[in-house]
Every structure is written in C-alpha cells, then in structure tokens.
A protein has these predicted regions:
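Cysteine-nucleophile active-site neighborhood
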Residues: 66-132
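Conserved beta-strand termini and adjacent loop/short-helix elements that scaffold enzyme active sites
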Residues: 46-48, 117, 149, 166
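Short, glycine/charged-enriched secondary-structure capping and boundary segments
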Residues: 21-24, 58-60, 77-80, 111-114, ...
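Short glycine-/acidic-enriched loop or helix-start segments at secondary-structure transitions
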Residues: 18, 74-75, 107-109, 158, ...
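Conserved beta-strand segments of alpha/beta enzyme cores
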Residues: 42-44, 113, 145, 162
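N-terminal beta1-alpha1 cap of cysteine-dependent amidohydrolase-like domains
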Residues: 1-77, 81-84, 90-92, 212-240
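Amide-donor transfer/coupling interface in amidating biosynthetic enzymes
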Residues: 2-11, 29, 91, 130-240
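A short acidic, often aromatic-flanked loop/helix-cap motif at beta-alpha or helix-coil junctions
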Residues: 50-54, 122-123, 154-155, 171-172
Length: 240
C-alpha cells in the first residue's frame, strides 16, 4: 500500500534568532511527531502563510492546518482563501485536522465564532477532557495533557460541529464535524524543550509571574501529544 499523502498547511514562519534558528518549523515538528510513531506519511508542505494552498483536494489524501502566533481576528491575505479551502474540505468530507490557529480557522470558516478570552493568556500545560468515545480513540485514557499557548478561543461552535473535548480554561478545547474534521486548541507537536524556549522568549509578553506560572505547569503536568498523534493517525486511516 502506498503511503497516505498528508498535506500540511503551515501558517507560521518563525524567522527569529531565538526560536526559528534553533528549532524545526511547524510542519517538521509534525513530521517528527508522526515519524517517531513509525507512521510515515508522504508529506507535502504548503506555505499558507505565504498564500500557498493546494490546487485541488485530490492532491493529498488528508490535510492538517498548523498553529500560528497570528490571530484569526486580524486581517490576513491568506485567510479568505483558507476559509474557502476549509469549506471545500467539509463539502467533500475530506479528512482535515486543525491545531491551535487551525482549530480556530476551521471554526470561523464553518460558521463558528472566535473571541479574545476574557481571562487572558492560557499558557503551559492544560488537560483536555475528551467527552466523546469514537473509533479512533482506542486508548482508555480520556484526560490528555497538552502544551497550550493562546489568547483567542472558540466561543461558539459551527452549527454542524460537536464538542469532543473541554478544558478548565478553554471550554471548547476540541471539536469534530462528521467523521472527517477534528480539531484541538492545543499543540500536540510541541516538545518540552521547545515549549520552555518559547516561554523564555515571551517573558516580556507574559510578565515574570505569568512566565513562572506557565513554567510550573510544565513541571507538574504531563504531555500526551504523542498519544494524541496516534489518535490523529487512526482518525485519518479510518478513511482508507
């Protein structure tokens, strides 16, 4: 059997000396995550932040939209075409995964709402409680810890979506549409080393207290990103 083709729509390009020069970019972090589980997709990266999108849904078997420090609440030239692409995936029931920014973009494209969280930044490790038992969630574990870094959140689901996971800070932590779209507000592709570097780089944004609180959550929390990546793999494989 040929490898399943996974198109990764990258909506971030970190060129900073502190982070971008020392860590793989978003698409490569996902590749590393999947490859570590010996699920080697045939990857194609689309630099959507540079207005690149697939020319056809048939170019790939499934798609994944990455996270980004950008906000769907702002005006970006790539957003309207990305929303059209998301709606096309939904209409064709094409397997689509969204993480962080991708989670929010899918919500907006399909008629949901994203707002700035009144409580401010949610940073560190947060547990998502999955409230739905589906075929791709074959592990008994239902409370998964994830790295998170966001200020915006999905405040209203699209009409056709259903909530599948919630967190203490983020009530809409994960949702699904049919059996072809699945999203998470979290970053399953982050590693502990990467997250700590990002936190250290964002002391000015978070403040000393915010940085200390987020760092403490890493020390006491658990990262279940690899487990969730197995769920993503099963979610995609269910279509083939």
């Amino acid at each position: 059997m040929d490898r399943i083709r996974l198109g990764i729509l990258q909506v971030n390009h970190d060129k900073s000396e502190t982070i971008g020069d020392h860590f793989p970019d978003d698409a490569h972090r996902f590749r590393d995550l999947f490859d570590a589980l010996e699920q080697r997709f045939a990857y194609r990266v689309y630099m959507t932040i540079g207005d690149e999108l697939p020319g056809s849904l048939d170019e790939q078997d499934a798609f994944l939209i990455t996270g980004s420090p950008l906000s769907v609440l702002d005006e970006h030239s790539f957003l309207p075409p990305l929303y059209d692409f998301i709606r096309a995936c939904d209409s064709a029931r094409k397997p689509l995964i969204g993480t962080c920014f991708g989670h929010q973009a899918i919500a907006v494209a399909l008629g949901g709402r994203v707002e700035r969280a009144a409580a401010g930044w949610n940073v560190g490790i947060e547990a998502t409680h999955f409230i739905e038992n589906t075929s791709f969630m074959t592990d008994a574990q239902r409370d998964l810890g994830f790295y998170v870094f966001h200020e915006d959140h999905v405040s209203a689901l699209p009409p056709q979506a259903r909530l599948i996971g919630r967190g203490d800070f983020c009530p809409t932590a994960a949702f699904a549409v049919g059996n072809h779209i699945m999203t998470t507000q979290a970053h399953p592709e982050f590693t502990d080393r990467f997250m700590r570097a990002v936190l250290d780089d964002c002391v000015g944004l978070l403040g000393q207290d915010g940085h200390a609180e987020a760092t403490a959550s890493l020390d006491r929390g658990r990262n279940d990103g690899p487990l969730f990546s197995r769920w993503i793999t099963r979610f995609i494989l269910n279509h083939f």
